[in-house]
């Protein structure tokens, strides 16, 4: 994926060195956008191997409205371990906001169900938006949402998605986010009878941690390979009925994994 390598290079060459919450230090730019045509292949990195199992299970976990890491641990996914409390809870993070956004009268809004229904009944609406950023509950979250708002758009029978990500850990997090939202777009397209269009990824604070510089430089020496295809079980017509077994990535060839520490 040339778009991703261009982002890495842009931040390394033009970014500003800054301090950060974790004390690690970053080099960052503010405001960057990438676009991926999903008809041209599934946008997963080929210049380092990604753990696709983690990406799929995390997305299914979000869609379940779950905020405890028990499901993830059961399926060998450890990406949230550092932030969970002793009971495995994370507070009202993504799944809660997506599926149970609290209202002042004590009710809840299922933003995802509302989104799907809106795409079916009023595809031309400009209100197909889901937000995970709830200012009233941010302090109760183990980690406030980095990928905090997304919008869907329908044109010529194709469904496109734009994500706004306030904070992007380019080396470790952003590759996961690209694949996750590309997959979500494909899933929503299938259950609404549309074709997958573009995934547009807009980043606010796009940063490389100081202890990822060497790894980023190594990745820039590698040449992108052709993108694989994501095959989704066509029998699934309900977004909340997808299971891990309904997805198969074919033709995925990637360079070896590059290890890097997580800044907590």
UniProtKB/Swiss-Prot annotation:
Pathway assigned in UniProt: Pyrimidine metabolism; dTTP biosynthesis
Family (UniProt): Belongs to the thymidylate synthase family. Bacterial-type ThyA subfamily.
HAMAP family: Thymidy_synth_bact
EC number(s) per entry: 2.1.1.45
GO cellular component assignments: cytosol
Quaternary structure (record): Homodimer.
Enzyme class (EC, first level): transferase
Function comment: Catalyzes the reductive methylation of 2'-deoxyuridine-5'-monophosphate (dUMP) to 2'-deoxythymidine-5'-monophosphate (dTMP) while utilizing 5,10-methylenetetrahydrofolate (mTHF) as the methyl donor and reductant in the reaction, yielding dihydrofolate (DHF) as a by-product. This enzymatic reaction provides an intracellular de novo source of dTMP, an essential precursor for DNA biosynthesis.
Organism field: Sinorhizobium medicae (strain WSM419)
GO molecular function: thymidylate synthase activity
Record's protein name: Thymidylate synthase
